Amino acid sequence: MFHGPTSSFLAPKIAFALVSFSLGELGDGLNIFQGIYLVGIGWNEGSIGIALSLMGLTALLVQTVAGDIVDKTTFDRRNFLIAASIVTALSASAILFVTEGNNEHALIFISKIIEGVASSFIGPCLAALTLASFGPDHFDAVMASNILWGHVGSVASAVLAGASAYILYPNIKYCFLVIGFSALIAVIFVRFLPEGDPLMGRGFKGKVALDESGQEEIIEGAPTEDLQHEQEAASYMSVFSDRNTFVLCLTGFFFHFANANVLLVLGELMGGDNDDGSPSRSAIPLIAGAIVTAQATMSIATIAGDRLTEKGFGRKPLFLFGLITLPLRCALIIYWKDAGDAFLLSTQVFDGLGGGFFGLIHPYLVADITFGTGRFNLVMGLTASCFGLGATLSNYIGQTVVEKLGHVASLSGSLVLSFIPVILFACFMPETMGKRGNIANKATEEKGKSYTNMEMA
């Protein structure tokens, strides 16, 4: 059954945009600034590395399960989103209670594990609510808006955190108050989101959805009432063994394996360190500038990708464009490593283009592949886990190479690896645009035949 907006105060698409903006500010807990703060109060690099890796490792293990829970839950997904936002903010804010000295590791380690679990539910919940409310026909446009405003929120978060960290340096812990404020905003606006059709939110075909203006419309080719409730989810084996899902997971793994370490190396090449190993005050605006440049470019890339999709450009060329920006970025950083901070900072434009197109097309591809199977959020979680595994290995191996062989060797490794996802996706992923309805119709028709045969028997 479809549940429309609970209030006419905000149009549903605007409510989703405001929630996405707030969650973008919540981001990843401003990990890079947390690392700066912990170095400043006496933590060693090894302890910081463990602390900042725990969230990613936990999310890596939990995201697929979180997606499956979001698919199968009978509870209101809006409550899941509220709980996940609050817990993420509280756990990320635990750093405010760490005292000076290389101690109190348990508090941060435990909070990062909790943060990893809670944050794993945010993406699937928001995607599920979007699909449940707007259906397959308007999902792309509204999801593009969500992603755009998420990037804008990340820009706002980086600007606020960077400015307060620079002003309060070296006592920068109060910049983390932006995390709690962002969670509060998210909780307020989540209540204005429609619940939509819970079955449609997991990738089944529904009868009613909202258009972009918030008006209800009948979905073309909708199943009968009996068939809608008789829809069964595809087996786990069929989902995990699907070739397109496998190619997407492998492509994303290698993209993030090559990409994640690059920002760390870039930060090490820009600015400078104090004698104790902590970033200098002059490095803080550069670090914030790198984040802002990338996120602002991602916003532009998201708008461009949405417009191109509306004009009929397929998923494959847009996703490939995002992948190709990574080897260009690595090559430019190597070439400009001694050219000055301005040149190095400008390479973040390529990070923004790559991340923008990758982040936009990823949920489109998952919706295309899974619609009609009832496993949309499961595959969103599975792919996110593969991406996270690549990023975690990238940070660990990339920084080990930096320590042993230097920055150029680490970047050269990323450059070579960055061609693997391009080749994989170009050779093995078919174009999926326009196939979403076909998958859903096929699933409905097969169920209809089965239902008719049972009645005849």
Where are these regions (language model features)?
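Juxtamembrane intracellular "pre-TM" segments in multi-pass secondary transporters
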Residues: 1-10, 197-248, 442-456
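Helix-loop boundary and gating motifs at the non-cytosolic
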Residues: 2-56, 246-251, 256-273
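Intracellular juxtamembrane helix-capping segments at the cytosolic ends
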Residues: 34, 121-134, 357-372
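Helix-to-loop junctions at the C-terminal end of transmembrane segments
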Residues: 62-75, 165, 300-314, 402
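C-terminal ends and interior cores of transmembrane alpha-helices
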Residues: 86-102, 324-338
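Cytoplasmic helix-loop-helix junction between adjacent transmembrane helices
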Residues: 111-150
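Glycine-rich segments within core transmembrane alpha-helices of 12-TM secondary carriers
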Residues: 141-161, 384-394
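Symmetry-related core transmembrane helices of the 12-TM Major Facilitator Superfamily/SLC fold
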Residues: 173-191, 410-427
